[in-house]
């Protein structure tokens, strides 16, 4: 059995003179969840539409389970999509919404009723079949949309920013539910989001896209710290990028020096480099060396941490500080870097 289940080969998509997907290759293994992550306009939604058959590639091929589906319609690809907007029918009951696709396939009433019951149980909505859309919450509506896709037992499940309309607590619980169901059912899945936390929470692999190409692939969160791309720094967590120097495992930014024990992981030669610092990698103290002194410009309490902007070494630095580790009345402090959350880049 071939484990390369969903394959995009040399895919290019142009609209007029504008190329939005440029010679893209992508392989999704059987039974895995892969997320396309990137800012608006990076091409991730176009890839989704190409896989689903909603758009045709300008060139290249798409294979599902070894079959060339490049020219196949969406009806012939055995794919289901969970949309951001849920797209539920308000005049139908929950059971009829979930069973709509089965009815279109001509599945008998008895089998349809049983499969709808099983699908609703999967998403913890047993007993909801007779309710209507306006009688359930947003999180429950999203689970109905998920059940409607799962009931068809598709070869490929596509999820298009499915959690963006939910509040923070619902997003957390729903991404856990989506991941649990995907692993339990073994459905090959393609997930699209611009939220990096969401991406890593649900995925076997994360694909970062920018300007129609794959910039990087990662299976672990270390990706965010160790191999983040300079061109995506603002999107990927507001890291601060500083001019620095590397010398045998010691990093210098101006007069501030600190050891970086995993410096060899970054494939950056000794000498001038770029040093990326994540907001959570910075600790503020009341004392320190002159080279670490910073001026507090602003501090906003975000509910579970302080988001601080400090001027240090001539640059505004974004810092996330725990409530018990920061004095909101402070006007100055001293910066300390922790190794986890520091990454190095070659100067272009």
Swiss-Prot record:
The ABC transporter domain, residue ranges: 6-236
Topology within the bilayer: Peripheral membrane protein
Classification via SMART domains: AAA (SM00382)
Binding site for ATP: 38-45
UniProt KW Zinc keyword: no
Entry's localization field: Cell inner membrane
Broad class of the protein's primary localization: membrane
One Pfam family from the record: ABC_tran
Keywords: ATP-binding, Cell inner membrane, Cell membrane, Ion transport, Iron, Iron transport, Membrane, Nucleotide-binding, Translocase, Transport
SUPFAM superfamilies: MOP-like (SSF50331), P-loop containing nucleoside triphosphate hydrolases (SSF52540)
Uppermost EC category: translocase
Keyword ATP-binding included in the entry's annotation: yes
EC number, UniProt record: 7.2.2.7
Catalytic activity: Fe(3+)(out) + ATP + H2O = Fe(3+)(in) + ADP + phosphate + H(+)
Listed InterPro entries: AAA+_ATPase, ABC_SmlMolc_Importer, ABC_transporter-like_ATP-bd, ABC_transporter-like_CS, ABC_transpr_FbpC, Mo/tungstate-bd_C_term_dom, P-loop_NTPase, Transp-assoc_OB_typ2
Subunit structure: The complex is composed of two ATP-binding proteins (FbpC), two transmembrane proteins (FbpB) and a solute-binding protein (FbpA).
Listed PANTHER family: SPERMIDINE/PUTRESCINE IMPORT ATP-BINDING PROTEIN POTA (PTHR42781), SPERMIDINE_PUTRESCINE IMPORT ATP-BINDING PROTEIN POTA (PTHR42781:SF4)
Family: Belongs to the ABC transporter superfamily. Fe(3+) ion importer (TC 3.A.1.10) family.
The protein's name: Fe(3+) ions import ATP-binding protein FbpC
Organism in which the protein naturally occurs: Actinobacillus pleuropneumoniae
Gene name of this polypeptide: fbpC
């Amino acid at each position: 059995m071939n484990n390369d289940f969903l394959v995009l080969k040399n895919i290019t998509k142009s609209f007029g003179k504008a190329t939005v997907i440029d010679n893209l290759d992508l392989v999704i293994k059987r039974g895995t969840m892969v997320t396309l992550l990137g800012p608006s306009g990076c091409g991730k939604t176009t890839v989704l539409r190409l896989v689903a058959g909603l758009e045709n590639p300008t060139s290249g091929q798409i294979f599902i389970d070894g079959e060339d589906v490049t020219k196949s319609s969406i009806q012939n690809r055995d794919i289901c999509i969970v949309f951001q907007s849920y797209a539920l029918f308000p005049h139908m009951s929950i059971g009829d919404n979930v069973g709509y696709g089965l009815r279109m396939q001509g599945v008998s009433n008895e089998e349809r009723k049983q499969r709808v019951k099983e699908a609703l149980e999967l998403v913890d909505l047993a007993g909801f079949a007779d309710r209507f859309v306006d009688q359930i919450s947003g999180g429950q509506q999203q689970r109905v949309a998920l059940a409607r896709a799962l009931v068809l037992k598709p070869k490929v499940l596509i999820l298009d920013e499915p959690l963006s309309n939910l509040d923070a607590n619902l997003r957390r619980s729903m991404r856990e539910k989506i991941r649990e169901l995907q692993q339990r059912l073994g459905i090959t899945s393609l997930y699209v989001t611009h939220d990096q936390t969401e991406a890593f929470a649900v995925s076997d692999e994360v694909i970062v896209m920018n300007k129609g190409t794959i910039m990087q692939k990662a299976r672990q969160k270390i990706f965010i710290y160790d191999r983040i791309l300079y061109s995506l720094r603002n999107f990927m967590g507001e890291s601060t990028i500083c001019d620095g120097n590397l010398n045998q495992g010691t990093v210098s930014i101006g007069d501030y020096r600190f050891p970086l024990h995993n410096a060899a992981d970054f494939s950056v030669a000794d000498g001038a480099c770029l040093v990326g610092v994540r907001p959570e990698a910075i600790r503020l103290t009341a004392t320190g060396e002159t080279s670490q002194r910073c001026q507090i410009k602003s501090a906003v309490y975000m509910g579970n941490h302080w988001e601080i902007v400090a001027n240090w070494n001539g640059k505004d630095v974004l810092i996330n500080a725990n409530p018990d580790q920061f004095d909101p009345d402070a006007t100055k402090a001293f910066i300390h870097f922790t190794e986890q959350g520091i990454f190095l880049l070659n100067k272009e």
